[in-house]
Amino acid sequence: MRRDVFQAIADPTRRAIITLIAVQAMTPNALAEHFETTRQAVSKHLKILVECDLIKQNHRGREIYYQLEVDKMKEIDKWLEQFRKIWEDKFSQLDDVLLNLKKQ
């Protein structure tokens, strides 16, 4: 089953996993040490992230390391940029309104 990227990053545990492996590739066991959950639960989260192409697996000997798919993250960031600009404009307008209210 192919999952939606935003469905994948909606979960706080998966976002935390992304943050951890953004720094360095990690094994499921190493990742599981950062959470109060089972290794199996972490593996399920990893599977979802792999399905969405947010992370990839690299085999090193008998170990599997997970690392961030930087190109996919850039693609998401590029798509979000259009909304970032809209909200920056809205916040700027709100700042102007608040400044005018403060002057009154």
Where are these regions (language model features)?
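Beta-hairpin "wing" of winged helix-turn-helix
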Residues: 50-61, 65-67
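N-terminal helix-turn-helix DNA-binding core of bacterial DNA-binding proteins
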Residues: 3-38, 63-74, 78
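Amphipathic alpha-helical dimerization/coiled-coil segments
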Residues: 74-104
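Short, hydrophobic-biased segments on the C-terminal half of alpha helices
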Residues: 46-47
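N-terminal amphipathic alpha-helix
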Residues: 1-11, 88-90, 95
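Charge-dense, helix-prone N-terminal extensions
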Residues: 17, 37, 55, 99-102
